[in-house]
């Protein structure tokens, strides 16, 4: 068996046999890894609580036939430590972990940008400088962008017409169409497209670009509308819902 080292975030764990667990990790160099931690469920396990979700760990592993084996684990930063006592932040963090796993469907395919986004998002949740819903939506939008699915917010997703003010009949990009890829002009607007408020679109752009001054000043109604659009857009492109999003408490 080949020995290798990596660091990453623990995404989830599941029981294996009477004393072991399968640990899913998003690694810096290895991408998403599924590895066995032997004896981790025993009271006197040498791993202790080092392999819990949200934890940034430094690992030594042996390659196995189907699952690798964790031989050593050291905590770099326990991002989950401040979260259980804060339900909105905890549920936002769980949604981040699930999303990161969905965006890395192929095992051992490098996904450094996704890992760095996840680390940044978990750090922001722990620091509590911004509302957890904003941190989550920023993470979701940027994850979509890394995967090549950034929504068009400043030009029509279909014809490319720019959002450069208003026409005689209103905004040039009055609608958001999930299947089209973002904002659309009146000519390209499909049936059933949403009509978000202008501040909602501005908030989405701020979260995507990292303009936290603008995002923090946003009103709750625009945050709620933004979250709904982001969730719908995410589900469309993943072709699968993020189950934990339904438990996120928006504030």
Segments (PLM) and residue ranges:
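Non-catalytic alpha-helical scaffolds and adjoining flexible linkers that form interface surfaces
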Residues: 1-251
């Amino acid at each position: 068996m080949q020995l290798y080292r990596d660091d990453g975030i623990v995404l989830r764990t599941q029981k294996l046999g009477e004393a072991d667990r399968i640990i899913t990790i998003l690694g810096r160099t290895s991408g998403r890894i599924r590895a066995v931690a032997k004896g981790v469920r025993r009271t006197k396990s040498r791993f202790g609580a080092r392999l819990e979700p949200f934890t940034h760990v430094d690992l030594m592993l042996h390659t196995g036939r189907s699952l690798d084996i964790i031989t050593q684990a050291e905590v770099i930063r326990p991002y989950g430590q401040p979260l259980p006592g804060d339900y909105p932040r905890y549920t936002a963090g769980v949604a981040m972990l699930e999303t990161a796993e969905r965006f890395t469907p192929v095992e051992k395919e490098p996904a450094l940008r996704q890992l760095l986004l996840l680390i940044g998002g978990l750090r922001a949740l722990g620091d509590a400088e911004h509302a957890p819903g904003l941190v989550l939506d920023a993470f979701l939008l940027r994850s979509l962008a890394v995967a090549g699915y950034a929504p068009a917010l400043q030009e029509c997703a279909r014809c490319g017409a720019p959002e450069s003010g208003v026409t005689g009949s209103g905004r040039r990009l009055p609608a958001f169409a999930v299947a089209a890829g973002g904002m659309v002009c009146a000519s390209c607007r499909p049936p059933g497209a949403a009509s978000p408020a202008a501040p909602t679109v501005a908030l989405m752009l701020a979260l995507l670009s990292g303009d936290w001054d603008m995002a923090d000043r946003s009103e709750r109604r625009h945050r709620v509308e933004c979250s709904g659009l982001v969730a719908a857009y995410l589900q469309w492109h993943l072709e699968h819902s993020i189950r934990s999003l339904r438990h996120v408490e928006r504030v």
